[in-house]
């Protein structure tokens, strides 16, 4: 049985190193759609929502939640334009539905500082409003980013 299915983090099982210290990747930030199984009708019902959605206006800056190294910039189906950053200990942060990537990253810059601009929030992929979809993975297993950020639900 996979750790995520038991509600245990990979960290608790020793599969990943210590999680990076995270700051919200958009400001101001609140969670419009939490991590976990989504219920409802339609083709994406009862599927894992592998991150959190942080509403932001189109064109707002998405910034690095932790210092890291750019591992991928790609367009991927429902996620649209996304960036993956790797962090020590087997951790990855993922930023999806971007409208644009900063030119330096698109030109090959690889190291980023915490809070550094990555791109602009957009509506690429499948989305029901402008927001940043933010994921946290430990050795490839999705974790709830909200457990590492001081964020609450949008009101």
Task: Identify the meaning behind each predicted range.
Residues 6-12:
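Bacterial N-terminal signal peptides
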Residues 49, 87, 97, 131-133:
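Histidine-centered active-site/metal-ligand motif
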Residues 14-82, 86, 114, 123, ...:
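Surface-exposed, glycine-biased beta-strand/turn segments
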Residues 1-5:
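Bacterial N-terminal signal peptides that target proteins for export
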Residues 132-140:
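A short hydrophobic beta-strand segment most commonly corresponding to one strand
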Residues 63-64, 73, 88-115, 139-141, ...:
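Short histidine-centered loop motifs in beta-beta connectors
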